[in-house]
Swiss-Prot record:
Keywords: Carboxypeptidase, Cell shape, Chloroplast, Hydrolase, Membrane, Peptidoglycan synthesis, Plastid, Protease, Transmembrane, Transmembrane helix. One of its GO terms (molecular function) is penicillin binding. It is a single-pass membrane protein. Its EC number is 3.4.16.4. The presence of this gene in the chloroplast genome suggests there may be an unsuspected vestigal peptidoglycan layer in this organism's chloroplasts. Gene3D superfamilies: 3.30.450.330, DD-peptidase/beta-lactamase superfamily, Penicillin-binding protein 2a (Domain 2). This is Peptidoglycan D,D-transpeptidase FtsI homolog. The gene is ftsI. It catalyses: Preferential cleavage: (Ac)2-L-Lys-D-Ala-|-D-Ala. Also transpeptidation of peptidyl-alanyl moieties that are N-acyl substituents of D-alanine. It comes from Chlorokybus atmophyticus. One of its GO terms (biological process) is cell wall organization. The lineage of its organism: Eukaryota, Viridiplantae, Streptophyta, Chlorokybophyceae, Chlorokybales. GO terms for cellular component: chloroplast membrane; plasma membrane. It is an enzyme of class 3 (hydrolase). Belongs to the transpeptidase family.
Length: 679
């Protein structure tokens, strides 16, 4: 028997070569398939696994008054979500613990919680202190989602001016709407690499994200004056039972709006509880016929055209027919003429002091209608002029009859002589009075000064109505800062949290949730700002103006002259006589020089013509007349007391404001106070 002989080495080599070649063939084929056919898809998949895109949170800029006092600020609110599937205690126990904090009956909470359900919203928009109380309970399956909330500390006092933001943090009214681009910062996106554990690679974070922006939108408003006007108007409306009212205070030299109050107002913090018509800033949107408050402007026009001189006298018969219409003075009695004004000659100052309609008709008869119309157009009245923009939305243009109608119908210039037949917004009339106060310059009213950097980072709270939760100071530079100076990627690394876990539970608008961890639900990008508390103090400090607005530049550089200095000086003296000897005596303040004019006008009806019962009363004042610093206009819509006039409805409101102004500004009397010695 032959011994066993193994196969030759050639056979074995061939077998090894064949197996190796076959393996290389399959490997090469697989590589070709992955590289050429699936390469693009695999590359995209790898990038998705190795990078993460996060949207950083950018709070809105604060809105502050002229002294830097915040009027609108960003703070934090919480939404509470429950996941009964992950409760470590019974539903009843969870409901009992949450009930006193949420102020919801325990049984009602239990009805919402299904044992196998998840993601149940129990409450939303909770203040920060309430959120912290819930977090302190350390309940498994209860998540708190942070999100920004706009807070308005002065509520109805500035509601009509500031406006509000909706649930998506977008401005919907007032300054919040008109200055949306200045208030809303762009939210940059961050694309960064992550390691195999899902932790952000720190050197991938661009330094640009940490650039600070502490700018606030500064207004011309003076909060202290705003409070005074709000209180005076509220009391005045109650006294005269008016439908609505407004107070405007302008700086006649610059056009800056120091005060804009409109009642009834609304609380921007809970805007959804108020009717939608209150969101409109009607002092800049709604037209009305100014009535007798327009008479000083007509006298100024007559003086400028040389149609009259200051010492001229006019026959005032108390009643006059113009075309098919009869015009009477307010105090005229057709059956028994009063001995005061009718059937007498009076100088212009007397006609204005007693608010004579007939006297004004005679004055304007000396001016050709086309010239008078051109002067009204020069004052930017009528459709030819653009709406008077004041940084508030929905501004309206004034109303003036067409020149052909104005010339062909003699009643039109006659009615305009005492402020009827033409219409304007309250802010427009205040602008015209500012031209009388500043020497004849038609300044442009504006509300927004520009973007300013506060002179102080922190102010201490004092005498301000703040909510019970802390208000955080925005620090736009530290977008990715979790706590003071600890970047988020370090927090995630220290906590062992994977970014991939965050991505699985991403929420709307860049909100990242960890719903299955104990009390760990956080907003990754919304702990962007530091936890420094913003404390408020209503004390004056001047912010540094960095970027003035277009309107502010226009007001200082592009104002135009409409009246001469001599004419406005005469008008100031006449308006002062209205306070001393005329219909404005109810605004007299002893020791101080005030100029003003009352106004009462009929309202239009929907059917056409004028209402016999509904009127608008007003009072415009310039204070002090020797050096005008304030133009104050009060308008009352539909006062409902017997014998309602501007003198007994609007003028007392202006007097109250001036008395408060004197007190807070420490203004000394300029006229000797005569004290009568009593026997």
């Amino acid at each position: 028997m032959k011994p066993y002989e193994p196969k030759s080495w050639v056979t074995r080599v061939f077998l090894v070569w064949w197996l190796t070649a076959l393996s290389c063939f399959f490997i090469s084929g697989r590589l070709i398939y992955l590289q050429l056919l699936k390469g693009k898809w695999l590359k995209e998949k790898a990038l998705k696994q190795q990078t993460v895109t996060l949207k950083t949170f950018q709070p809105r800029r604060n809105i502050c008054d002229r002294n830097g006092i915040p009027l609108a600020i960003d703070t934090l609110a919480y939404d509470v979500f429950a996941h009964p599937l992950y409760f470590s205690i019974s539903i009843e126990e969870v409901a009992n613990k949450l009930s006193p904090i949420l102020c919801i009956d325990s049984l009602s909470i239990q009805k919402l919680l299904k044992p196998t359900s998840t993601g149940i919203c129990l409450a939303s928009q909770l203040p920060e202190n309430t959120g912290k109380l819930i977090a302190s309970l350390r309940l498994d399956g209860i998540d708190l989602i942070k999100h920004p909330k706009r807070y308005y500390p002065y509520k109805e006092i500035v509601g009509n001016v500031i406006g509000y933001v909706d649930t998506s943090h977008q401005g919907q009214a007032g300054i919040e709407l008109s200055c949306q681009e200045s208030l809303q910062l762009n939210s940059p996106t961050l694309t960064s690499s992550i390691d195999g554990r899902g932790v952000l690679i720190s050197h991938q974070i661009p330094k640009e994200l940490f650039i600070q922006d502490n700018l606030s939108l500064q207004l011309t408003l003076d909060l202290e004056l705003q409070k005074i006007a709000y209180k005076a108007l509220k009391q005045g409306l109650e006294n005269c039972k008016g439908k609505r009212g407004t107070v405007l205070i302008l700086d006649p030299k610059t056009g800056g709006i120091l005060t804009l109050v409109a009642l009834p107002s609304y609380d921007p913090n809970i805007y959804y509880d108020f009717p939608i018509e209150r969101f409109k800033p009607w002092p800049v949107t709604d037209l009305y016929e100014p009535g007798s408050t327009f008479k000083p402007l007509n006298i100024a026009i007559a003086l400028e055209t040389k149609a009259i001189s200051p010492e001229d006298s006019f026959y005032d018969e108390g009643c006059i027919r113009v075309g098919d219409s009869i015009i009477t003075n307010n105090d005229y009695n057709s059956y028994k003429p009063l001995p005061c004004l009718p059937n007498t000659y009076n100088k212009i100052v007397k006609l204005l002091a007693n608010s004579s309609n007939v006297g004004m008709v005679h004055i304007l008869e000396r001016i050709a209608p086309e010239i008078y119309h051109s002067w009204l157009s020069k004052l930017d009245l009528g459709h030819a002029a653009s709406p008077l923009e004041t940084d508030l939305p929905w501004a309206s243009e004034s109303s003036l009859k067409d020149i052909n109608e104005f010339v062909c119908y003699e009643i039109e210039p006659a009615a305009a002589s005492f402020g009827q037949g033409l219409a304007m917004t309250p802010i427009k009339l205040a602008q015209l009075y500012a031209s009388l106060a500043n020497g004849g310059i038609l300044v442009k009213p504006y509300l927004v000064t520009g973007l300013a950097n506060a002179a102080e980072d922190t102010q201490k709270a004092k005498g301000i109505d703040l909510p019970s939760y802390n208000i955080r100071k925005k620090n736009l530079g530290n977008h990715l800062s979790w706590h003071k100076a600890e970047p988020s990627y370090l927090f995630l690394k220290r906590s062992g949290i994977r970014v991939t876990d965050l991505l699985r539970h991403i929420k709307a608008e860049g909100r990242f949730a960890l719903p299955f961890r104990k009390n760990l639900l956080q907003l990754f990008t919304q702990d962007a700002h530091r936890t420094t508390e913003l404390q408020l103090e209503p004390k004056a400090h001047q912010p540094q103006l960095l970027r003035p607005t277009r309107h502010a530049v226009y007001a200082t550089n592009q104002s135009k002259r409409v009246f001469s200095h001599e004419t406005t000086k005469l008008l100031l003296d006449m308006l002062e006589d209205v306070i001393w000897n005329g219909t404005g005596s109810s605004c007299f303040v002893e020791g101080y020089r005030i100029g003003g004019k009352t106004g009462t006008s009929q309202k239009h009806t929907q059917e056409g013509g004028y209402s016999k019962t509904k009127i608008i009363t007003s009072f415009a004042a310039i204070f002090p007349t020797e050096d005008p610093q304030y133009v104050i206009l009060t308008v009352i819509d539909e006062p409902n007391i017997p014998l309602s006039f501007g003198s007994n409805t609007a003028a007392p409101i202006v007097k109250s404001i001036i008395e408060s102004l004197i007190d807070i500004k420490k203004m000394k009397p300029t006229i000797p106070i005569i004290k009568v010695k009593k026997d």
